[in-house]
């Protein structure tokens, strides 16, 4: 199925690219998320008329994400307190929601979908490096210091 991308999609293309994808991927993900439209003659003409607007919108989103990444880089280590045992293991865990709330409270708005924890939730006290995926091209790293109550 031919679609025109309205946003940058990882490993697929950038704004304005006309790509061939599987029908289910287009119908169930790209089109409902507003990341693509069907590549019909009418949509191609409509897209060409809006190309400058969409590219400006994409550039604005990129610059906003870069500004947020710079603000995150200037943050000191963020402290999260949690109950822990004597051996340094937490009673529970610190998850993406806790990290997103702590970073947002520190002054930079972050949603839980932007927090990346590849090894799962944090379960020990100490300092942890957490990656934030702010944009398709922008990533940031924040230091989370988990301390015992």
From Swiss-Prot:
- Gene Ontology molecular function, alphabetical: rRNA binding; structural constituent of ribosome
Q: Which UniProt key words apply to this protein?
A: Ribonucleoprotein, Ribosomal protein, RNA-binding, rRNA-binding
Q: Tell me the InterPro entries matching this sequence.
A: Ribosomal_bL9 (IPR000244), Ribosomal_bL9/RNase_H1_N (IPR009027), Ribosomal_bL9_bac/chp (IPR020594), Ribosomal_bL9_C (IPR020069), Ribosomal_bL9_C_sf (IPR036791), Ribosomal_bL9_N (IPR020070), Ribosomal_bL9_N_sf (IPR036935)
Q: Which GO terms describe its cellular component?
A: ribonucleoprotein complex; ribosome
- GO terms of biological process kind: translation
Q: Report the domain of life of the source organism.
A: Bacteria
Gene3D superfamilies (UniProt xref): Ribosomal protein L9, C-terminal domain, Ribosomal protein L9, N-terminal domain
Which residue ranges run through the membrane? Answer: none
In terms of PROSITE patterns, this protein maps to:
RIBOSOMAL_L9 (PS00651)
Q: HAMAP family of this UniProt entry?
A: Ribosomal_bL9
* Entry function: Binds to the 23S rRNA.
**Protein family:** Belongs to the bacterial ribosomal protein bL9 family.
State what protein this is by name. Answer: Large ribosomal subunit protein bL9
The lineage is: Bacteria, Pseudomonadati, Pseudomonadota, Gammaproteobacteria, Pasteurellales
